Amino acid sequence: IGLYIAADPHTFDMVELAEQTPFAGSSLAGGLVLAAILIGLAVKTPTVPFHTWLPPAHTDAPAIGSAVLAGVLLKMGTYGFVRIAMPMLPEAWRDWAWVIIVVGIVSVVYGALVALAQTNVKRMVAYTSVNHMGYIVLAVGAAGLIADDTTQARSIAVTGAVTQMVSHGLITGALFLLAGVLQDRAATYDMDSYGGLAGPAPRFAAFFAVGAFASLGLPGLSGFIAEFQIFTGSIAAAPVTAIALVGILLTAALFLRALQRKQLRET
């Protein structure tokens, strides 16, 4: 509504709003409008501290519902950052860039740490969504810091964010469907209830391993391509974003642990 009122002529057309940048030169009003937009998009994405609805939603939803939620619905939040907030409020976005970067870093590390502590495979994958959405927020925040003379780094960061949206949707959607297979066959998501699945269910084990390796960013898979672009662009803008590299190590640890508990450990 704020963008509509400030636009001249009044419009909800996103292309026209991006061309007008209605709050150019008004840092206070632009900052308030951006803050409202960011809170709404942060809930939808979700990022820390607005993430608490996501794990219960995934845990209680059927596998297909979780796949659609992760693959499509969460992307409406991150799409909003790239399509609405950044182009329509560029000055305010630059002013808020460090806040956005910090939220992204916290989401990356926190999501991975909490996922590492889970025994429920579906909740584990749900918390990795917080982790992976954090990478996107980190990238778009870093893009706000990059000056016009480093447009290549800015482009790489934003391209990495968009690639991560697609990659996360495919990978995490697949992992939720595979978790649904476990629930369908054994009526539980508890990883400790399984063991040695690689023997009796080799195809399931192979599919889950591919999904896990893609999610942790193994080179050659889409997760690596997205994260490489994100960090290439982000670290050029703000070296502090390298802290988020810890999230990659934690994600590798949690998925390797899950593979060992479900597929290799003898019961």
Please report, for each region that a protein language model flagged, where it lies by residue:
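Alpha-helical transmembrane segments and their helix-entry boundary regions
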Residues: 63, 67-68, 124-125, 157-161
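Alpha-helical transmembrane segments
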Residues: 27-40, 101-102, 159-174, 238-252
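Hydrophobic/aromatic positions within or immediately flanking transmembrane alpha-helices
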Residues: 37, 68, 101, 125-126, ...
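C-terminal ends of transmembrane helices
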Residues: 45-59, 109-128, 180-183, 259
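Small-residue-rich segments of transmembrane alpha-helices in multi-pass membrane proteins
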Residues: 1-2, 63-79, 129-142, 201-211
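Juxtamembrane/interfacial segments at transmembrane-helix boundaries in multi-pass membrane proteins
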Residues: 1-51, 56, 81-99, 142-159, ...
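Predominantly late transmembrane helices and immediately cytosolic-facing juxtamembrane segments
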Residues: 48, 172-178, 241-267
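Cytoplasmic/organellar membrane-interface segments at the starts of transmembrane helices
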Residues: 61, 192, 198-204, 255-267
